[in-house]
UniProtKB/Swiss-Prot annotation:
The active site is at Y101 (proton donor), K172 (proton acceptor). It holds the Pfam family malic. PANTHER family: MALIC ENZYME-RELATED (PTHR23406), NAD-DEPENDENT MALIC ENZYME, MITOCHONDRIAL (PTHR23406:SF34). It comes from Aliivibrio fischeri (strain ATCC 700601 / ES114) (Vibrio fischeri). This is NAD-dependent malic enzyme. CDD domains: NAD_bind_1_malic_enz. Its EC number is 1.1.1.38.
């Protein structure tokens, strides 16, 4: 809660206080605090404001030439003085978000053991499967409200990184705080170390994780179940976000737990919510509705299928039947268009196959319809890439789409930048500036024929911090599909292009606090409506959201007994 004017009673002093990131003020400790907390002589004489500290930190940051060094520097500040870290990041959010999260966090995960400085969060190894309660009791933060957990098997588009995947929960929770106002004292990153099948990690003498092939099957499922039960015993009201689990586990885990605990999967549901929000904004800018679109996906994994199901749900809410909506969505993977009768489809893919009657008149030289075949025959108006394979939105694909669609909506969403299906610069050139583009990673504006086209980053950070804020502010007990749909609609209402006819599809990151609060309000209202939180007035709800929103300012300290 926001109690910045009230003093905080601290049981630590001396080096112990300076070594506690949540409490350390560094050179901002007052004369009185230095005296009563045994800090005299441990700090330089000057007493600085947080603004002065932030100015120095930013100058130091600017001295680093490559993004990895900048990432390491910011993580060091986070592990030294969290209040200063969040003030610095919030002051330079557009510049620093790509450093603390995608795309730089991908390289940080790959090099996690090599750049390791200090532990953060919890590393729960399969070797300790019978001691999970003890490990949770060791967490530095004990008033935990939100957990981001990964098993490190599908880190962005980089695959199995073992415990290196810890960089993702750390980065995600940094955005919960920087964008959504969740106090860092209430956050906990966790990696479930069930081994790794990455030969590079296993052969690396620096690798710090459990050197063992990945645990799978019933042993894996039982381990996750034991973890969830332990979390429920220790923090029964905590929001659990599943992050970067492999396709074979992501959807089954979500289905197993979404009706048992307060949880969601950001790769599936968060990505779907921000994509639907961006699509709603794009449709409004193009003068149409989502239910009028024909949507093609390249990539039919759990993320792509999750987005597709969210799009279908929104189409149905606009008045068309479920069957009609599904006939307008085309899923393409490495084997071609998902069709009836294809072997080896996963359960969540089965509901998204195209029926034979819908493709019986299509023309193709191959029995399996390729992406270009889908462009020619289905004539889609929306193209979404979640394949993790660079360059697959070729000039032929985009121009074939543009032949029958004046303003194609093209979202190459794969992360990091090296995995993007096509660059915005190419898409804008190939469509002569007519395409509406959003990407998964940050890209600079595109200049074409004397015009500048800002590129929206279809970034989950526009969604999940607001969801977390709304859930925690009213103590919601579940995260439902309907709550996520409301987050999409709230995001679309913030689109500069949809509102003013100019600018990017999504608002600038400098407005992320107001966006997160708007999403939090919409999500919380739906939770109340569905009976997942106590009923309160709109005015009281807004007050709860405002009071819950943490700000990076130093509080006065008073000493209490050890």
């Amino acid at each position: 809660m926001n109690n910045n004017k009230r003093p905080l009673y601290i049981p630590y002093a001396g080096p112990a206080l300076l070594s506690t990131p949540l409490l350390n003020k560094g050179s901002a400790f007052s004369t009185t605090e230095r005296k009563y907390f045994n800090l005299e002589g441990l700090l330089p004489e000057a007493i600085e404001s947080i603004e002065e500290q932030t100015g120095r930190a930013y100058k130091q940051y600017q001295n680093f030439e490559n993004d990895m060094d900048k990432h390491i520097y910011l993580r060091n500040i986070q592990d030294t003085n969290e209040t200063l870290f969040y003030r610095l990041v919030q002051n330079h959010i557009s510049e620093m978000m790509p450093i603390i999260y995608t795309p730089t966090v991908g390289a940080a995960c790959e090099n996690f053991s090599n750049i390791y400085r200090r532990g953060r969060g919890l590393f729960i190894s399969y070797e300790n499967k019978n001691r999970i309660d003890d490990l949770l009791n060791n967490a530095a933060n004990q008033n935990v409200k939100v957990i981001v957990v990964t098993d490190g098997e599908r880190i962005l588009g980089l695959g199995d990184q073992g415990i290196g995947g810890m960089g993702i929960p750390i980065g995600k929770l940094a955005l919960y705080t920087a964008c959504g106002g969740i106090s860092p004292a209430h956050t906990l990153p966790i990696v479930l170390d069930v081994g790794t099948n990455n030969p590079q990690r296993l052969a690396d003498p620096m690798y710090m994780g459990w050197r063992h092939p990945r645990v799978t099957g019933d042993e894996y499922a039982d381990f996750v179940e034991d973890f969830i039960q332990a979390v429920q015993r220790r923090w029964p009201e905590a929001l659990v976000q599943f992050e970067d689990f492999a396709q074979k586990n992501a959807m089954p885990l979500l289905e197993r737990y979404k009706n048992r605990i307060c949880c969601f999967n950001d790769d599936i549901q968060g990505t779907a919510a921000v994509t639907v929000g961006s699509l709603l904004a794009a449709c409004k800018a193009a003068g149409s509705s989502l239910s009028e679109q024909r949507v093609t996906f390249l990539g039919a994994g759990s993320a792509g299928c999750g987005i597709a199901e969210a799009i279908i749900a929104q189409m149905v809410s606009e008045g068309i039947s479920d069957a009609q909506a599904r006939s307008q969505v085309y899923m393409v993977d490495r084997w071609g268009l998902l069709q009836e009768g294809m072997p080896n489809l996963l359960d969540f893919q089965q509901r998204l196959v195209q029926k034979a009657e819908n493709t019986k008149d299509w023309v193709s030289e191959e029995p399996n319809f390729s992406l270009v075949d889908v462009m020619r025959n289905a004539k889609p108006t929306v193209l979404i890439g979640v394949s993790g394979a660079p360059g697959l939105f070729s000039k032929e694909v985009i121009q074939e789409m543009h032949k029958h669609c004046e303003r194609p909506i093209v979202f190459p969403l794969s992360n990091p930048t090296s995995r993007v299906e096509a660059t915005p610069n190419d898409i804008i050139r190939w469509t002569d500036g007519q395409a509406l583009v959003a990407t998964g990673s940050p890209f600079d504006p595109v200049a074409h024929n004397g015009q500048t086209y800002p590129i929206a980053q279809c970034n989950n950070s526009f969604i999940f911090p607001g969801i977390g804020l709304g859930v925690l502010a009213i103590k919601a007990t579940r995260v439902t599909d309907e709550m996520l749909m409301e987050s999409s609609r709230a995001l679309a209402e913030c689109s500069p292009l949809a509102i003013h006819g100019t600018g990017a599809l999504l608002p600038p990151l400098e407005e992320i606090h107001s966006v997160s609060k708007r999403i939090a309000f919409a999500v919380a209202k739906k939770a109340i409506e569905q009976g997942h939180a106590l009923e309160i007035t709109d005015e009281a709800l807004q007050q709860k959201i405002e009071s819950y929103f943490w700000k990076p300012v130093y509080r006065r300290y008073k000493r209490t007994a050890f």
